Amino acid sequence: MPYLLEMKNITKTFGSVKAIDNVSLRLNAGEIVSLCGENGSGKSTLMKVLCGIYPHGSYEGEIIFAGEEIQASHIRDTERKGIAIIHQELALVKELTVLENIFLGNEITHNGIMDYDLMTLRYQKLLAQVSLSISPDTRVGDLGLGQQQLVEIAKALNKQVRLLILDEPTASLTEQETSVLLDIIRDLQQHGIACIYISHKLNEVKAISDTICVIRDGQHIGTRDAAGMSEDDIITMMVERELTAIYPNEPHTTGDEILRIEHLTAWHPVNRHIKRVNDVSFSLKRGEILGIAGLVGAGRTETIQCLFGVWPGQWEGKIYIDGKQVDIRNCQQAITQGIAMVPEDRKRDGIVPVMAVGKNITLAALNKFTGGISQLDDAAEQKCILESIQQLKVKTSSPDLAIGRLSGGNQQKAILARCLLLNPRILILDEPTRGIDIGAKYEIYKLINQLVQQGIAVIVISSELPEVLGLSDRVLVMHEGKLKANLINHNLTQEQVMEAALRSEHHVEKQSV
């Protein structure tokens, strides 16, 4: 039986650099292939070649789809063949309705007039295929990210897709939304639709894939049956080394209490009747890693936003640092108290994309380079930038490169470098490894361990329970704004954490002292 897709000996160069070096990939109709590799390995370049974003003639090699050679000059050419790609940054127009987005560029017309009756009938069939029940007049911007992802798939199905490429489709989805998406992909597979799945979440890769293809440094390392591979096998192929412990568990001792929060309550910024955080109290010791776990909407991010002075609504409660009550109502006051934070959404809140990597690093600590005068000491700033880039292993061709051009992992390391310039005593990490590859994750985990060995207290908020359990000395479990458990991490399991989160009563387990 002929393959649906064959990419033969693809090579793509940028100047003297080979981004893709003689890579081949093939898959059958209805097959799900996961494409794995660190950021910068060449995955995205290979997919851009396949989709016509890099046109025929700009690369070497051959692409055969459904028995015919593709020589695409534009992404529309491959879409007509039945190839569709859905990027991590969704390509929906938020101000248009769901129906308008699905048919954008593929409108059904009759005598030059759009036939809304036919489009509505087609719309209902498409949404049934992705298990959505939404009015066609609903504005896309009013949907959650999980629903928007399914609208993108429905849009692809409207183009008679035969090969669906999903690039980090669950990076911003909840576990429930992820489960729905994976079920839909499996259902599409039963209808003969093939899928190339790109994700850093190896548990998803294992769960969804028939075959796993690994690319490293632009080269094809190997393609194997998913059933015969463990997550450790995938990691070793990706990074060319064994990460014997993904979560470095280097010994560190905790000191005395540095932070205490008492009876913290925060209200919705618009609706004062809704409590986003409800009477939460906890403490933190020097050199301790405190994890905060809970489902989406649990109040984790809202809690630490109050601590850092950036919660947009009203809140009340008491914050003590070194036993002294402090008033923190903005981020500058938090920084003055020795608190730094890596935000949940790095693109929205963590970086200035068009600004240089170096300037992003020093952005919050410019007073270090003024020496009491208004003029910056450029030499001192540049020295600090280079030291930070080296210390955090930020991969960039130049400190002057716009940070928006870096991979997610390197953007995150630059944000961490900025935080460390503030000499924090308390470091808050909200989703510290979201959307970054396993190698960058490992480096960040090692850094966290180094920081607590220096006596810095760290708070980690993560939607990935294995990450919380792998890093934390102690775990707070939140649900619907309430603190449900305060657990010492003596071989805690995911089941124990979820059980604590979903208890109907408000019960805080007593912690060891």
Swiss-Prot record:
<keyword id="KW-0997">Cell inner membrane</keyword>
<dbReference type="Pfam" id="PF00005">
    <property type="entry name" value="ABC_tran"/>
</dbReference>
<comment type="function">
    <text>Part of the ABC transporter complex XylFGH involved in xylose import. Responsible for energy coupling to the transport system.</text>
</comment>
<dbReference type="GO" id="GO:0005886">
    <property type="term" value="C:plasma membrane"/>
</dbReference>
<dbReference type="InterPro" id="IPR003593">
    <property type="entry name" value="AAA+_ATPase"/>
</dbReference>
<keyword id="KW-0677">Repeat</keyword>
<dbReference type="InterPro" id="IPR013455">
    <property type="entry name" value="ABC_transptr_XylG"/>
</dbReference>
<feature type="binding site">
    <location>
        <begin position="37"/>
        <end position="44"/>
    </location>
    <ligand>
        <name>ATP</name>
    </ligand>
</feature>
<dbReference type="InterPro" id="IPR050107">
    <property type="entry name" value="ABC_carbohydrate_import_ATPase"/>
</dbReference>
<keyword id="KW-0547">Nucleotide-binding</keyword>
<protein>
    <recommendedName>
        <fullName>Xylose import ATP-binding protein XylG</fullName>
        <ecNumber>7.5.2.10</ecNumber>
    </recommendedName>
</protein>
<keyword id="KW-0472">Membrane</keyword>
<feature type="domain" description="ABC transporter 1">
    <location>
        <begin position="5"/>
        <end position="242"/>
    </location>
</feature>
<feature type="domain" description="ABC transporter 2">
    <location>
        <begin position="259"/>
        <end position="505"/>
    </location>
</feature>
<keyword id="KW-1278">Translocase</keyword>
<dbReference type="GO" id="GO:0015614">
    <property type="term" value="F:ABC-type D-xylose transporter activity"/>
</dbReference>
<keyword id="KW-1003">Cell membrane</keyword>
<dbReference type="InterPro" id="IPR003439">
    <property type="entry name" value="ABC_transporter-like_ATP-bd"/>
</dbReference>
<keyword id="KW-0813">Transport</keyword>
<dbReference type="GO" id="GO:0016887">
    <property type="term" value="F:ATP hydrolysis activity"/>
</dbReference>
<comment type="similarity">
    <text>Belongs to the ABC transporter superfamily. Xylose importer (TC 3.A.1.2.4) family.</text>
</comment>
<dbReference type="InterPro" id="IPR017871">
    <property type="entry name" value="ABC_transporter-like_CS"/>
</dbReference>
<keyword id="KW-0762">Sugar transport</keyword>
<dbReference type="InterPro" id="IPR027417">
    <property type="entry name" value="P-loop_NTPase"/>
</dbReference>
<comment type="subunit">
    <text>The complex is composed of two ATP-binding proteins (XylG), two transmembrane proteins (XylH) and a solute-binding protein (XylF).</text>
</comment>
<keyword id="KW-0067">ATP-binding</keyword>
<dbReference type="GO" id="GO:0005524">
    <property type="term" value="F:ATP binding"/>
</dbReference>
